[in-house]
């Protein structure tokens, strides 16, 4: 028994050795920056012209200023609105395509090709997508030219000067970039469902809609929860598309300014105290959402 125990210890030693590179990278690039961010959030540290103010310890003053300032609530509303405008069509489209291409009864050909094509937008850089949409929807772009030629409008419509259309473009771009990833996840979940359940439902005379709502959707619950929460976390971190499309201004009338763009403004102006406080708030929100995912998926496993 002692010899066997010694062998187990020796084998486990290699597991710990292989973990060392990950631990080192995590400490350098994750843990130390996190501690530094929390530390800086309690200090007044910014540039006033060419003069460096601080660092001076101010306690929770940065957090109080952050929440007393009305800007954070405006940008939180913008961030959540952009996420909702993107996620609702994204999840509907992904569910429809996933159910369509994973349905054994339809026996559609070319599903492998479809899986590749639908994921391609996810590989395109946000900067390239933004420049493409900026060109397409500019005043002299092809979309305005086409609408004027068919007589739908008389003068070029300023898509980026209207809050609704600007938000719509950002939501559309994010939907196109990420719906492929969601579709693949849902398709994998649907294809993992036991086909005998569908066969039994067919024998009982269930319609396609009844099968989808009563069998497919309930069994997809863990994956749907994962998709919703990860999408929400991604929505909180929305930055690249509106930053490039509006050149960091969040126009028109700050309607496309997100929380991460707000954070970037503080970092660009070297207001490290406020940037640290905002980062900590976002970190706490992300941590709470991650805990929700863990609890829900854990409950599903225990029920299973």
PLM regions with names:
Residues 7-304:
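A structural signal for multi-pass alpha-helical bundles of membrane permease subunits
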Residues 1-4:
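N-terminal leader/signal peptides at the extreme start of proteins
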């Amino acid at each position: 028994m002692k010899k066997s125990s010694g062998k187990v210890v020796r084998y486990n030693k290699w597991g710990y050795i292989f973990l060392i590179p990950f631990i080192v990278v995590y400490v350098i690039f994750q843990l130390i920056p996190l501690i530094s961010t929390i530390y800086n959030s309690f200090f007044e540290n910014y540039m006033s012209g060419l003069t460096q103010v601080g660092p001076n310890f101010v306690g929770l003053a940065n957090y109080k200023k952050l929440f007393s300032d009305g800007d954070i609530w405006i940008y939180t509303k913008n961030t959540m609105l952009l996420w909702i405008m993107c996620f609702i069509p994204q999840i509907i489209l992904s569910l429809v395509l996933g159910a369509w291409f994973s349905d054994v009864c339809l026996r559609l050909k070319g599903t492998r090709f479809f899986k590749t094509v639908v994921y391609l937008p996810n590989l395109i850089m946000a900067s390239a997508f933004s420049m493409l949409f900026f060109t397409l929807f500019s005043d002299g772009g092809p979309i305005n030219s086409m609408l004027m030629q068919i007589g739908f409008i008389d003068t070029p419509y300023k898509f980026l000067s209207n809050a609704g259309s600007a938000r719509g473009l950002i939501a559309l771009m994010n939907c196109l970039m990420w719906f492929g990833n969601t579709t693949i996840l849902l398709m994998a979940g649907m294809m993992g469902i036991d086909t005998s359940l569908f066969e039994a439902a067919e024998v009982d005379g269930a319609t396609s809609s009844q099968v989808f709502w009563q069998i497919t959707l309930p069994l997809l619950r863990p994956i749907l929860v994962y998709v919703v929460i990860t999408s929400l976390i991604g929505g909180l971190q929305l930055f690249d598309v509106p930053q490039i499309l509006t050149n960091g201004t969040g126009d028109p009338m700050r309607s496309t300014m997100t929380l991460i763009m707000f954070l970037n403004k503080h970092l660009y102006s070297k207001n490290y105290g406020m940037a640290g406080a905002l980062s900590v708030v976002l970190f706490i929100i992300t941590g709470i959402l991650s805990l929700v995912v863990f609890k829900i998926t854990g409950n599903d496993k225990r029920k299973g």
